[in-house]
Regions:
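Transmembrane and membrane-interface helices of multi-pass
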Residues: 2-220
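Residue-level recognition of alpha-helix termini/interfacial anchor residues
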Residues: 36, 141-146, 411, 441, ...
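Short, function-defining helix-loop hinge/capping sites that tune catalysis or transport
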Residues: 37, 67, 282-283, 494, ...
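Short, hydrophobic/amphipathic alpha-helical patches that form generic packing surfaces
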Residues: 54, 100-103, 224-229, 617-620
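Soluble catalytic regions of membrane-associated enzymes that act on cell-envelope
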Residues: 195-545, 553-565
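Membrane-interface soluble catalytic domains
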Residues: 201, 514-634
Length: 634
């Protein structure tokens, strides 16, 4: 029992407690920044001031949502009784502890996702069959997150013990007045402003408080992100262009391979490499501290059709396969989890299956993990091989799946049994947090600035052995090998790989040993380009819908699209950053201005206008077709 708690009127007690919770949210914002300072970079005192001021505005909304029941019940007459007060104290601690827990978890998770957790992100948890192992690993590796959360809980307990209300009696009129006033203030608080002529405070409003668009996640909290994105999974149609001919002239997703000739029944093997970042490659990174960890992939890349500037379309594993197989870019939420996931997509596996191909997908994770098995079936994959089919739990890494080297050996052995022609994809797992390699080979591979670099080398060596084992197969020369990472690593050492361009730079290349295709291109590659480029190599002669480009055609625009909080549009040498309303807010020559320090928006307005116009045509085609289920050619 506290002998001298501070006692106030019930209304003032609520105000003081909420104010102290707002202070804790600001502290959690600082903690969030500290854990991700390599991503956000240094902030000046002025920048911090506006982040905290803007953050307070967003936190008021989130904290009012979190404490709505506590506020209303406390101010009702039953809330004056001692028993009810204890119940509401517990409610106050528990609900605010959950809100602060979300902020703490996101301080670690943000590096993987590059955006705050949203309502749609929570659905991704259903796809993990190994949730227990993942949670155990998270508890151990990110112990400081839980330590910070326990400190926040301690602060909440101190608040309810020291800031208490008197048991005052009021007449019915006073109760009604206080309750109505509180309710009205809460309604305005939920909106984030006092004007009904404006929209409620949204995620895009955070841009007012930062200089760099990539720092908006510092302003709003994770609870705010979740509350504001509930029910917002639906896309909205755009009408930037009312003239269909004008729209199609700027961007037409209905594509067809160029040239004439019979369809080439070549085998297709797609290798999706977990978290392989351009930073670990010597092809475009000259820093020897980080560029020496995928020697085989680099050597194979130089024998392939490749570029120094290739990009992921998203930042999650679950976003990679729709981009690679279906030429679908990343958008508000992962396509696999969206309401549009049942849309008709004439994907690369489906096209080839209709041509008589054997189709397969290999993923060493527990069967069904991340919803890949179901999605693969929708995309035309007839044969799925996961941890269950591998059948040897002694090779399980304890968290994500079968170690890459034995699973790649299993892939090679199984691939040799398939009838030709075949389409097959493998998705590696070992270079995933916590970036472990088998103990027996720990000393075989070099260490880097972060454990993921050793994991890169381990998987890279597994890929070398895989290609050694199949290079004498009779079908090898008649096979198109596509190598792409799913996304970049959450841990980057060099500043140029931590900005909004670098965090999407991955290897994407085409190795075709039986054709004279090898060479370095000066074009921009992205994952959505894989499908149209493979179909061009095979001389597929039917129209299809793709939101990438045929890299072998000089007629296609040289662009890439990805989402970093908001969309960004890469076009040749330029990067255009867009706000939530798809208006350009930053223009950079990203190839020479590697840290994106010189905004050319005002000095090159014509270029900015051109890129914005191209992007708006692209996004209008994409979203309107997604809503109308028009991803196939009738």
């Amino acid at each position: 029992m506290i002998k001298n708690p501070y006692r106030y009127s019930p209304w003032l007690t609520v105000v003081l407690r909420i104010s102290l919770v707002l202070l804790l949210f600001s502290v959690s914002r600082v903690f969030f920044y500290i854990q991700n300072r390599d991503i956000f970079g240094p902030l000046s005192a002025t920048e911090w001031f506006w982040v905290l001021v803007g953050g307070l505005r967003f936190d008021v909304v989130a904290v009012l949502y979190i404490n709505l029941l506590y506020i209303l019940f406390t101010l009702l007459p039953p809330g004056r009784h001692a028993g009810a007060t204890r119940v509401f104290d517990v409610l106050f601690v528990v609900t605010n502890a959950i809100g602060l827990l979300l902020n703490c978890i996101d301080s670690a998770y943000y590096a993987f996702n590059l955006k705050r957790i949203a309502w749609g992100s929570l659905g991704e948890l259903k796809g993990f069959n190994n949730a227990t192992e993942l949670l155990s690993s998270f508890l151990v590796r990110y112990w400081y997150v839980w330590a910070a959360w326990l400190l926040f809980i301690g602060a909440l307990v101190l608040i309810v013990r020291y800031v208490r209300s008197t048991r005052q009696k009021y007449n019915a009129h006073t109760y009604v007045d206080v309750f109505l006033l509180t309710f009205i203030l809460c309604m305005f608080g939920f909106r984030g402003n006092l004007r009904y002529s404006t929209r409620p405070l949204g995620l895009n409003d955070a841009g007012k408080y930062v200089r760099s668009p990539q720092n908006v996640a510092l302003v709003f909290s994770t609870p705010f992100s979740i509350f504001r994105t509930i029910g917002e999974a639906r896309l909205e149609k755009y009408s930037y262009f009312s003239d269909e001919k004008e729209l199609e002239a700027l961007y037409n997703p209905v594509q067809q391979s160029e040239g004439e000739g019979p369809f080439r029944k070549m085998n297709v093997v797609v290798l999706v490499l977990e978290s392989f970042s351009e930073e670990a490659s010597s092809v475009s990174n000259t820093n020897t501290t980080t560029n020496r960890f995928m020697p085989f992939v680099d050597s194979l890349r130089k024998k392939s059709f490749y570029t120094e500037y290739s990009f992921a379309n998203g930042k999650k594993s679950i976003e990679a396969l729709p981009s690679i197989w279906g030429s679908i870019p990343s958008y508000t939420q992962p396509y696999v989890l969206s309401e549009y996931s049942s849309n008709k997509i004439y994907s690369l596996p489906l096209i080839l299956r209709d041509k008589g191909y054997h189709t397969s997908f290999f993923h060493g994770a527990p069967n069904g993990s991340m919803g890949f098995q179901s999605f693969a079936n929708l995309m035309g994959i007839d044969h799925y091989y996961g941890k269950d089919e591998f059948g040897d739990n002694s090779q399980f890494d304890g968290i994500w799946g079968i170690w890459d080297q034995p699973f790649l050996a299993y892939y090679s052995k199984t691939l040799k049994t398939f009838p030709q022609p075949f389409f097959s994809t493998i998705f590696t797992v070992s270079s995933h947090d916590p970036f472990k390699v088998p103990k027996e080979v720990e000393n075989k591979y070099p260490s880097g600035p972060h454990p993921i670099f050793k994991a890169f080398s381990y998987t890279d060596d597994g890929l070398r052995k895989f290609f050694e084992s199949i290079k004498h197969e009779p079908w090898f020369q008649n096979t198109i090998f596509v190598i792409s990472a799913d996304h970049t690593s959450p841990k980057c050492d060099l500043p140029e790989f931590r900005n909004s361009v670098g965090v999407f730079r991955i290897p994407v290349f085409f190795y075709v040993p039986g054709m004279d295709l090898a060479g370095k291109s000066d074009r921009v590659f992205q994952q959505t380009d894989i499908m149209p480029t493979v179909l061009q190599i095979m001389q597929y002669d039917q129209p299809y819908v793709s939101f990438g480009k045929n890299l072998l055609s000089p007629k296609t625009k040289d662009f890439a699209v990805n989402k970093y909080e908001n969309y960004q549009y890469i076009y040749g040498d330029f990067l255009l950053k867009l706000d939530a309303g798809n208006k350009g807010v930053g223009l950079y020559r990203y190839k020479t201005d590697k840290l994106l320090e010189k905004n050319l928006l005002e000095t090159e307005p014509d270029t900015a206008q051109l890129l914005e116009r191209n992007f708006k045509a692209y996004i209008q085609q994409f979203q309107n077709r997604m809503i109308d289920d028009r991803f196939t050619v009738k």
